[in-house]
UniProtKB/Swiss-Prot annotation:
Keywords: Calcium, Citrullination, Keratinization, Metal-binding, Repeat. The gene is TCHH. This is Trichohyalin. Residues 314-377 are annotated as: 5 X 13 AA tandem repeats of R-R-E-Q-E-E-E-R-R-E-Q-Q-L. It comes from the Eukaryota.
């Protein structure tokens, strides 16, 4: 609503609020009006700055006579008040003064404008009826004021912009000044430092020097941050400028393109070439600029590192600083020289490339004139993509800037935290000084408090640990449940699929059998219509009955299937119930174990308390021996009581366990009994239903058929001597035995677990008692040994007292350490126990799966037996029918042949079924063996792990005891502080060794898991390959048989026709045929000789020509004898040949599809092998890196003299790596050649290569395992040597303290140097990775090109092989036909004699009939003439139509020929261009390889020049190797060129032959060529789409690379930050070494817990990742299997359809032949109609075929896209895993730095922790929860990514339909919106009209009411008739108000 309407509504609402309703209507009384004025007009009345308003109000009230105010009067009153108050309202409210004080003179116009607008709004309607000129003046004035205000606003905006520009300039000047000042300050500070280097130590104390250094460091850091900010701003400006330039260039290019389009095509081509050159140059320039920027950044980073190193060295030693400065300057100069040289070399290379590109471009201009049209579209697409890339880059840059800002903020916060921490440290130092005085008095109190607090803390920690363990267990349970459910679901799905497939196969077989039977029956009925009409009726009845029987059988089968499904469901429910029960049992067991563990912990706590009390007693023995005795007594009593309690609890627990087991066993027995009863009932019901169904069938079936079936059943019962009752009993017995076995196994497992638990508890108790006894014995020895002379005794007593005082501080800490160690051991045991439980669970699952598989196999065997019985019944019935037919037909020879054929088909089907069964059995056996092997491997690995863990634990315990003994001896001999240091160092070493061992174990486990996965995948793929090959072989055999049968049938039919139609000319034909066959054989021999030379397509052409010649000769002979018959036969033959060829083409296409699928699989396998090899290489590199790190650690322990040798060795290693990389470059082209050979040559060689690769992989794995074993042994030996050294040094400790300190300093220096070297190595590794990525991309592109080149070669080879196979089949068929022809001739002669006799008899009968019918014919002649005339007319019409169609077809043929000719020419041109491009790409590739080699050689040469001359022999060796490599490459290059030339020649020959063949076959294949052309166009379009998609994929890959680079930059920043932090830490450590040495024990102890927790979490995360990865792999495999199954189903369905069509065609052909023999007179008229119908049907069928083929081709790219997306997803997933691993490593490093910092904080805040420990615990708990949340978020993100990938795959197939739907939806929405807007407008107009009408009506009504009262209220006249009384209370109130405010 508008403000005016709101104000009107407010007025009406206010009036209604104060109105009093009476009989006269709604009106205001004086009281109501008083209230209204007081409340609403109070501000005007109380502070009337303008008294006119009050006077006007009083005047209006005086005029009122009634004392009542109507609504009209109220409105007039309000409008008058508004008119009076308009100019004085601001004064009344007190707002004018504030506005005037705030606003300037410029705002006066705006206020006037607003006032006028308000006046215009609130004017009444009566004022609107004034004169029009006044309104126009006001409008003009308002418009002028608006224009002025707008101008002022614009001027203000301009002023603001100018001010902003000025501010920016001032800021820039200020920044420049600041920079200049900072530079001057730096110089001054550096000069001061250089001048005061020697005097700083004397003049200033350490604290002042540290403060100055800290301030300098802070200033330096601030400057560096500012510099970084400036650089970032410069980068932004540079990027914006680049974008502007790009936009300008794009606009210029667009304009130029528009101009070129208007000009001639030649100019367009030239300009396009120039544009391409410009773009290439620009891209090259951009790449160069980016490279230069990266180099500059690297230089800056290096310079920063060097500066930081210089500062560190200055702090340590002045002399070393000078030397290092000189060295670094030299290094910088060398690096700069190297960079300059590299830049010069790059420039030279760029110039060379430009020259070469110019040459190439000149050649391209000559060659690629026709390609440019096609490239225009591609360029436009590239421009769009580049624009998209730029936009995405902008967004990423913005994101980078935001991240950098966040990082800076975090750095600032950390700095502030550092300052605060330093202040806290100082305060703590002061507090410690004050507190040291009071510590002696409060020690005892503190000890007590600390003990109590620690107990509380331990309890809380235990509670937290319990919660965490419970959560973990719940998670494990959930994961296990999910895995089980998924496995069950998968098994069920597989079973269902198998059942569906079997059902489909059964239905198809039944359908095929039915169709064959129907066809045979129809043939027999048509042949024997005249003689066997009575038999036909009987057969029809039999067929109907059989169909009924089949239907009933189908219904029975469906019912049986439903029952089986019900049984399966019930079995599934039972399994779920069993699983639930098992889960409940496990939960109960876990609860029991938890309770036992809790009790054990309590016991341990009690034991620990007892130990503590014993220690206290020992301390107090010297002072209070009586108390000690009492305590001992109490302790002994307490121990006895506790032991009794423990025994009682154990007994109770055992009783409860027994009771629970008995209850569970009873429940299981009851459930088993119920299940037995239910199964029996179900079986009985099923048997009853089957019997009822049999009785019904018997009642319906006639007696004779029932007798046949009963006889068949009797025979089957004789053959199969296994009745159903025996089978049911056997099943029940087997099930009972299986259940008993399960129960026994469960009981045995439970007993084993209980026994293990008891053994573990006994071992723990023995260990605790042994430990206590050993401690007591050691203390007794110490007391006995400590008895020297008196002086020494006194001194030792004093020392002992001091030690006691100090030990009292550290006793609780030591106790905590011991407790934690015990907890660790307990955790390890618990983990072992959990692992054992998991193993048992796995075994149980495996057993269950095996049992289920056995059950499934048994069910399958039963079903097979049932199916076999049914098939035997059906076959037996068929055989009986055939026997009857033989008896009825008196055993005719034609029927015998048919029976033979049927028998052969049945035999083939039986053989196929047997093969399938064998294959299934083999698969099942292979799977079972594989599972058994996996189980054995797992068990062996578990045993090995357990043994290793036991050994390690024993060694650790032994070492721990030795260390304790050594510590005690050292404490007796030596002082206090050095002893503590040694202990700390030993503990630190021990922990480091433990960590190293754990890391090694983790690495070994990961490697084993990887190997297992790889082996499993390899075995699985091998099996799949073998299965596929076997299936392919079977398919090929079936197809060959079918082809042979078709050819045989076709030839038999032709021979029968010829013999029946040409009985007289058989002898002539035989002679001529023999001659022709002899000639044909001679020609075939010549052809075979030519095939050996060429082996290509001319064979088919020649054969076709010869066959055509033979057929033409035969047709000429037949024309001489029977012209009419020959014409019809020719037509039929042509049609049949055309159909046969079409079928062959369809088969060829299907075979090509089937062949392409294994090729894809082979490619995938090759890619997989390549990836595996890359992974192996990466693993080898990792091993080498680990060896290098270990060697570096060993070298750091040596002196500086050994560093030079280390450098030389490192150089040698770098050379080796370069050589390896060179070898890799050499190996990769060799591998590519091998891949080509593999693809070109036969399958045998591929299999051999695969076997060789597998053998090599196995050898490599074995060698890696041996290396790892040797490395582990070497590491153990080194550790033992180090321990011995440490022991020797500890013995000579007092003499070697100074040496140790010096060694520590040297170790620190070496650590710094090693860190620097590590950074350099990381940079080198990153460079290597980048190179590898670029190489990998280049190789992928090359592989794609090679695959494109090899596709036509493969197709040609396949066609060649297929032709050779066809020739062989033809030869075999020809020989077989010759033999069959002889037999058939003999049979035909015999038949001919019989038929002659029959003809004679028929002629006699015909003569008699003719005499009788002659009279009847004379009458019918007239009718026949009429019919003939009609037929003649119809024939004429048909002839005319045929002529028209022929002309039309000829015209279409001509057009199509022209189109095809053009299309072929274009194809040839495209092929030539592609070949040229390939040649150029190969040349470029070789040129790049040579350039890379030159670069490497130059780099090696420069590196060698710097080295000593002692390495000359190595150089010579390398040169010889390089020469050999060059020779090999040249030789390979020549071989490749020769191969390419041969391929080109072969292609040219093939093209010439294809061209001739196409010219000959144009007339025959016109219709087919149209469809082929369409398919080819679609294929091109799809190829273009694929290219576009590939480009998009490459773009995504580039984006991923950019993200990786950014992450690497962030990593470098983090590393720098960590390095700074470490430097600060070192400074703090130098100050507080004494305090740190005292407090290291507590810190280390506190560190161990979070480390263990992290390790546990990491293990859990790794397990989860592995599990998810496996699940995804399984899903992918299932998806692939589903696709393969669907493809097989589709293929089978197509084959069946083809068979049915062929059978229908053959049936129709036979029907036509029979009709011709019987009805020769009516044959002419009907044949023409049949031909037409057949042509139409064939056209429809072809259309359907081509439609299906097109659909398949459309689906192919989608499937390929899905496969590519899956591969990309897998690749991304792997890359993400690698990135995650790197991030985790970085996190660990950062966590280590943070850990050190936290440790220092803990050391500083120990005293505060005593008061704030509960808060710290809560904080730790929160921190852990946050970490868990973060991990969960990461998991969710991963899941979301996976879900997105899956969603993308799912929606990829539906994108087209969605887009179309979206467009339609958008159009509909637009229409709907338009309609809605139109309706809203109409409604708005209607409402306005209605409101206006309503207002008019109200005014009219009110005017009428005023007339009724006798008054009219008009705006200019007297509104009120008489004067009111002045004595009203309201009048007095208003006068009082007036008197108050008047002067």
């Amino acid at each position: 609503m508008s403000p005016l309407l709101r104000s009107i509504c407010d007025i009406t609402e206010i009036f209604n609020q104060y109105v009093s309703h009476d009989c006269d209507g709604a009106a205001l009384t004086k009281k109501d009006l008083k209230n209204l004025l007081e409340r609403e007009f109070g501000a005007v009345l109380r502070r009337p700055h303008d008294p006119k308003t009050v006077d006007l109000i009083l005047e209006l009230l005086d005029l009122d006579s009634n004392g009542r105010v109507d609504f009209n009067e109220f409105l007039l009153f309000i409008f008058k008040v508004a008119q009076a108050c308009y100019y004085a309202l601001g004064q009344a409210t007190g707002l004018d003064e504030e506005k005037r004080a705030r606003c300037d003179g410029k705002e006066s116009l705006l206020q006037d404008r607003r006032q006028e607008e308000d006046q215009r709004r609130f004017e009444p309607r009566d004022r609107q009826l004034e004169e029009e000129p006044g309104q126009r003046r006001r409008q003009k004035r308002q418009e002028q004021e608006r224009e002025l205000a707008e101008g002022e606003e614009q001027s203000e905006k301009q002023e603001r912009l100018e001010q902003r520009d000025r501010q920016r300039r001032d800021e820039e000047l200020w920044r420049q000044r600041q920079e200049w000042q900072e530079r001057e300050e730096r110089r001054a500070e550096e000069e001061q430092l250089q001048s005061c280097k020697g005097h700083e130590t004397e003049e200033f104390p350490d604290e002042e020097q540290l403060r100055r250094r800290e301030l300098l460091e802070l200033r330096r850091k601030g400057r560096e941050e500012k510099q970084q900010q400036r650089r970032e701003r410069q980068d932004r400006v540079f990027q914006e400028e680049e974008e502007k330039e790009w936009r300008k260039r794009e606009t210029v290019l667009r304009k130029e393109e528009e101009k070129l389009q208007e000009e001639e095509p030649q100019r367009q081509r030239e300009l396009q070439e120039e544009e391409e050159q410009l773009r290439k140059l620009e891209r090259q320039e951009l790449r160069r600029e980016r490279q230069e920027e990266e180099q500059q950044q690297q230089r800056l980073r290096r310079e920063q590192q060097l500066r930081r190193k210089q500062e560190e060295e200055r702090r340590e030693q002045q002399e070393e600083r000078r030397e290092q400065q000189e060295r670094r300057e030299q290094q910088e100069e060398r690096r700069e020289q190297q960079l300059r040289r590299e830049q010069e070399e790059r420039r030279e290379q760029q110039l060379r490339r430009e020259q070469e590109e110019e040459r190439r471009e000149q050649q391209l201009r000559r060659e690629q004139e026709e390609e440019r049209r096609e490239q225009q579209l591609r360029r436009e697409q590239q421009l769009r993509r580049e624009q998209q890339l730029r936009r995405e880059q902008q967004l990423r840059r913005e994101q980078q800037l935001r991240r950098e800002q966040q990082l800076r903020r975090e750095q600032q916060l950390r700095r502030e935290q550092q300052l605060r921490r330093e202040q806290q440290l100082r305060r703590e130092q002061e507090e410690e000084r004050h507190e040291q005085k009071h510590e002696q008095e409060r020690r005892e109190q503190r000890l007590k408090r600390e003990q109590e607090e620690r107990r509380d803390w331990l309890k809380r920690e235990e509670e937290t640990e319990r919660h965490e363990q419970e959560r973990r267990k719940q998670q494990l349970k959930r994961d296990q449940e999910e895995e089980r459910r998924e496995r069950w679901l998968k098994l069920e799905e597989e079973e269902r699929r198998e059942q569906q497939e079997r059902r489909e196969q059964q239905l198809r077989r039944e359908q095929e059998e039915r169709r064959e039977q129907r066809l045979k029956r129809q043939e027999e009925e048509e042949r024997l219509q005249q003689r066997l009409r009575s038999e036909q009726q009987l057969r029809r009845e039999q067929e109907e009955r059989r169909e009924q029987l089949l239907k009933r059988e189908e219904e029975k089968r469906l019912e049986q299937e439903r029952r089986e499904q019900r049984l399966k469901r019930e079995q599934e429910e039972r399994r779920d119930q069993l699983l639930k029960r098992e889960e409940e049992r496990r939960q109960q067991r876990l609860k029991r174990e938890q309770e036992e563990r809790l009790e054990q912990r309590l016991k341990r706590e009690e034991v620990e308390r007892l130990e503590q009390e014993e220690r206290r007693e020992q301390r107090l023995k010297r002072e209070e021996p009586e108390e000690e005795r009492r305590q001992q007594l109490l302790k002994s009593e307490e121990q006895e009581e506790r032991r009794q309690q423990q025994l009682r609890r154990e007994q109770q627990e055992r009783r409860e366990q027994r009771l629970k087991r008995e209850e569970e066993e009873e429940r299981l027995e009851q459930r088993l009994k119920r299940e037995h009863e239910e199964e029996r009932r179900e079986q009985e019901l099923a048997e009853e239903e089957q019997e009822q169904a049999r009785e019904r069938i018997k009642s319906r079936i006639p007696k004779w058929q029932w007798q046949l079936e009963s006889e068949a059943d009797a025979r089957q019962s004789k053959v199969y001597s296994r009745p159903r009752k025996q089978e049911g009993q056997r099943r029940r017995q087997e099930q009972e035995e299986k259940r008993r076995r399960r129960e026994s196994e469960l009981q045995w497992q439970e007993e084993e677990r209980a026994h293990r638990q008891q053994q573990e508890e006994e071992q723990r108790r023995d260990f605790t008692w042994q430990w206590q006894a050993e401690e007591k014995s050691e203390r007794g020895r110490q007391r006995l040994s400590a008895r020297p002379p008196l002086r020494e005794q006194r001194e030792r007593q004093l020392r002992a007292e001091e030690r006691q005082q100090r030990e009292q501080r550290f006793l609780p800490e030591e106790e905590e350490k011991e407790q934690r160690r015990r907890q660790r051991r307990e955790r390890e045991k618990e983990l072992q126990f959990l692992e054992e439980e998991e193993q048992l669970q796995r075994r149980e699952r495996a057993q269950q799966l095996q049992e289920e598989e056995d059950g499934l196999q048994e069910d399958q065997e039963r079903r097979r037996s049932q199916e076999q019985r049914r098939d035997q019944k059906w076959r037996w019935q068929l055989e009986e029918e055939r026997k009857r037919r033989r008896h009825t037909l008196y055993a005719k020879p034609a029927l015998q042949e048919q029976l033979r054929k049927e028998q052969q088909l049945l035999q083939e089907e039986e053989e196929e079924l047997q093969r399938e069964e064998r294959e299934k059995r083999r698969r099942q056996e292979q799977e079972r063996q594989y599972r058994e092997e996996e189980q054995l491997q797992q068990e062996e690995e578990q045993l090995l792990r357990e043994e290793r863990e036991k050994r390690r634990r024993q060694e650790r315990e032994r070492q721990y005891r030795k260390d304790k003994k050594l510590q005690q001896k050292e404490e007796q001999l030596l002082g206090e502080e050095p002893e503590k240091r040694r202990r700390q160092e030993r503990e630190k070493k021990y922990r480091e060794e433990e960590e190293l061992q754990q890391e090694e174990e983790q690495l070994l486990r990961e490697e084993r898991e990887k190997r297992r996965r790889q082996e499993w995948e390899r075995q699985y793929r091998k099996k799949d390959e073998l299965q596929q090959e076997e299936e392919q072989l079977l398919r090929e055999e079936r197809e060959k048989r079918r082809l042979q049968e078709r050819e045989r049938q076709y030839r038999e039919e032709e021979e029968l026709q010829q013999e029946e139609e040409q009985l007289l000319g058989e002898e002539r034909e035989t002679r001529r045929r023999q001659e022709l066959e002899r000639q044909y054989r001679k020609e075939e021999e010549l052809q075979q000789e030519e095939e050996q030379l060429l082996r290509e397509e001319p064979e088919k052409r020649r054969r076709q020509e010869r066959e055509r010649q033979c057929r033409e000769e035969e047709e000429l002979q037949q024309e001489e004898e029977q012209l009419l018959r020959e014409e019809r036969e020719k037509r039929r033959r042509q049609e049949l040949e055309r159909q046969y060829r079409e079928e062959e083409e369809v088969q060829q296409e299907e075979e090509q599809l089937l062949r392409e699928e294994p090729e894809k699989r082979r490619r995938q396998e090759l890619e997989r092998q390549y990836r595996e090899e890359e992974e192996l290489q990466q693993e080898e590199e990792q091993l080498l890196r680990e060896e290098q790190e270990k060697r570096r650690q060993e070298r750091e322990r040596q002196y500086r003299e050994e560093e030079e040798l280390q450098r030389q060795k490192r150089k040698q290693r770098y050379r080796d790596e370069d050589q390896r990389s060179d070898l890799k470059w050499q190996w990769e082209p060799e591998k590519e050649n091998a891949v080509r050979d593999n693809k070109v040559y036969c399958k045998g060689r591929e299999n051999e290569q695969f076997r060789q690769l597998e053998d090599s992989q196995l050898r490599d794995r074995q060698s890696q395992q041996d290396l790892q074993h040797l490395l582990g042994e070497q590491q153990e030996r080194d550790r033992e040597q180090e321990r011995r050294r440490w022991q020797q040094r500890d013995r000579h400790f007092p003499e070697e303290e100074q040496l140790e300190r010096e060694e520590q300093k040297e170790a620190k220096r070496r650590d710094r140097k090693s860190q620097e070297e590590k950074q350099l190595l990381r940079e080198e590794r990153e460079e290597k990775r980048r190179r590898q990525e670029t190489d990998r991309k280049f190789r992928e592109e090359e592989q794609l090109l090679q695959e494109r080149e090899e596709q036509p070669l493969r197709r040609q080879e396949r066609d060649r092989k297929f032709r050779e196979e066809e020739l062989r089949h033809q030869e075999q068929g020809r020989k077989f036909l010759e033999e069959e022809q002889r037999l058939r001739r003999q049979e035909r002669e015999r038949k001919f004699l019989k038929e002659e006799q029959q003809l004679r008899c028929q002629e006699r009968e015909q003569q008699l009939r003719q005499d009788r019918d002659r009279k009847f014919r004379e009458e019918e002649q007239q009718l026949s003439r009429q019919e003939r005339d009609r037929k003649f007319r119809e024939e004429e019409q048909q002839v005319r139509r045929q002529e028209r169609e022929r002309k039309f077809l000829e015209e279409e043929q001509q057009l199509r020929q022209e189109r095809h000719r053009k299309f072929r020419e274009e194809e040839q041109l495209l092929q030539e261009r592609e070949e040229q491009q390939l040649h150029r790409q190969e040349r470029d590739r070789k040129f790049l390889e040579e350039e890379q080699q030159l670069r490497r050689q130059e780099r090696d040469r420069k590196f060698r020049e710097q080295e000593l001359r002692s390495q000359e022999p190595e150089r010579k060796f390398l040169e010889e190797e390089q020469q050999l490599h060059r020779q090999q490459r040249q030789r390979k290059f020549l071989q490749e060129e020769q191969q390419l030339r041969r391929q080109e020649r072969g292609q040219q020959r093939r093209q010439d032959r294809d061209r001739k063949f196409r010219e000959e076959e144009q007339l025959r294949q016109e219709r087919e060529e149209q469809q082929l052309s369409r398919q080819e166009r679609d294929r091109k379009f799809r190829l273009e789409e694929q290219k576009v998609r590939r480009q998009e994929q490459e773009r995504k890959f580039m984006e991923d690379e950019q993200q990786l680079r950014r992450q690497e930059g962030q990593q470098q920043l983090r590393q720098e930050r960590d390095r700074k932090f470490r430097e600060d830490e070192q400074l703090l450590q130098e100050r507080e070494e004494q305090q740190l040495h005292r407090q290291e024990r507590d810190r280390k102890f506190l560190e161990e817990e979070p480390q263990l927790r992290r390790q546990e979490r990491e293990q859990q995360l790794r397990h989860d990742r592995d599990r998810k990865f496996r699940e995804e792999e399984q899903l992918l495999q299932e998806g692939e299997e589903q696709q393969l199954r669907r493809q097989e189903r589709d293929r089978k369905f197509r084959e069946e359809e083809q068979q049915l069509r062929r059978q229908e065609r053959e049936r129709k052909f036979l029907q036509e032949e029979q009709q011709l023999r019987r009805q020769e007179l009516e044959r002419k008229f009907r044949e023409e109609e049949q031909l037409r119908q057949e042509t139409e049907q064939e056209q429809l069928r072809r259309q359907e075929r081509y439609r299906k083929i097109l659909e398949e081709e459309q689906l192919r790219p989608e499937r390929e896209e899905q496969q590519l997306r899956r591969q990309e997803r897998d690749r991304k997933f792997r890359e993400e895993e690698q990135l995650r691993q790197e991030r985790e490593e970085q996190q660990l490093r950062s966590q280590e730095s943070d850990r050190k910092f936290r440790e220092e904080e803990q050391l500083r805040q120990e005293r505060e922790e005593q008061q704030l420990r509960p808060q710290q615990r809560d904080g730790k708990y929160r921190w852990e929860e946050e970490q868990l949340q973060l991990e969960e978020q990461e998991q969710r993100l991963r899941q979301e990514r996976d879900r997105q990938y899956r969603a993308e795959e799912q929606f990829a197939t539906q994108e087209k339909s969605r887009r179309e739907e979206q467009e339609l939806w958008q159009e509909e929405e637009q229409k709907r919106r338009q309609e809605r807007e139109r309706k809203l407008r109409e409604e708005h107009i209607r409402r306005q009209q209605k409101e206006e009408q309503r207002h008019r009506q109200v005014g009219e009504i009110k005017s009428q009411e005023g007339k009724g009262h006798g008054r009219l209220l008009e705006p200019g006249t007297h509104q009120f008739a008489s004067v009111p009384v002045r004595s009203s209370p309201l009048y007095e109130y208003i006068q009082e108000q007036r008197s108050q405010y008047r002067p």
